[in-house]
Amino acid sequence: MIRVEFLKVFRFLTVLPIGEHPKSPREIGEQAWLGLPAVGLVSGLLAGVVAWAFAGTPVRGCLVVLTLLVLEGAQHFDGLVDVGDALMAGVISEEGATKAMRDPRVGVGGLAIGSMALLLAVASFGWIPFEVLVPIEVFSRFTVLPMAAVGEPAPASYSGRVFTEYVDADQVLLGGILSTVVSLPFSPVATLTCAVCSAVVAWTCLEAARRTIRGVNGDFLGASIWVSRVLSAVCLSSLPW
């Protein structure tokens, strides 16, 4: 039964044609502890292969970022851009923040945050060792679990409800153990660094979501993945490998 549910989680989180489309939030939420780190493992391996194949070339960082964007259908990056618009509009009012997130157009806040994230990601991924891509991707996905376990869903948010209703402390513990076990063989230093970055980002994004739209939604969850990814990559790129 876990196998079937896991495949549905994988289909929900990526563009890869694996498994059936989930028919209910329960099918996604109850296996999030397994699906999120597993998706991170696959994306990290694919990105790592690209980083290894193009090591020493000026396009390495661009191709790694492109690989990640394609794999996730750019949905997490879209969430990051929406959050950028919401944070700017949220200074005025909560209604303005919600409206900004639903607006298909990109505002100044989204453009600024999205551009900065891409620039930092391209620069960092062009420098770091290819093997640390797995810990980065695994723990960037793990960031969703503590946010969902502690946070409440934002009003009228399907994605927020998918995770917040079914993710609890046990899932956070299981997901943390799984993420650590999967990441350690690739790089103990990167595993510790990414775990710390994930915790910091989860708390920061959760507080931002509470203050902006009174809860967690899919955009903030997706944004947390990107912020954790970029922060981990920047920190690791500063180490003397």
From Swiss-Prot:
Its EC number is 2.7.8.26. Keywords: Cell membrane, Cobalamin biosynthesis, Magnesium, Membrane, Transferase, Transmembrane, Transmembrane helix. Pathway: Cofactor biosynthesis; adenosylcobalamin biosynthesis; adenosylcobalamin from cob(II)yrinate a,c-diamide: step 7/7. It comes from the Archaea. It is an enzyme of class 2 (transferase). Disulfide bonds: none annotated. GO terms for molecular function: adenosylcobinamide-GDP ribazoletransferase activity; cobalamin 5'-phosphate synthase activity. It is a multi-pass membrane protein. The keyword Transferase applies. It holds the Pfam family CobS. The chain crosses the membrane at residues 34-54, 108-128, 184-206, 220-240. Coiled coil: none annotated. GO terms for cellular component: plasma membrane. Its cofactor is Mg(2+). Its main location: membrane. It is found in: Cell membrane. The keyword Cell membrane applies. One of its GO terms (biological process) is cobalamin biosynthetic process. It catalyses: alpha-ribazole + adenosylcob(III)inamide-GDP = adenosylcob(III)alamin + GMP + H(+); alpha-ribazole 5'-phosphate + adenosylcob(III)inamide-GDP = adenosylcob(III)alamin 5'-phosphate + GMP + H(+). Joins adenosylcobinamide-GDP and alpha-ribazole to generate adenosylcobalamin (Ado-cobalamin). Also synthesizes adenosylcobalamin 5'-phosphate from adenosylcobinamide-GDP and alpha-ribazole 5'-phosphate. Belongs to the CobS family. This is Adenosylcobinamide-GDP ribazoletransferase. It comes from Methanopyrus kandleri (strain AV19 / DSM 6324 / JCM 9639 / NBRC 100938). The gene is cobS.
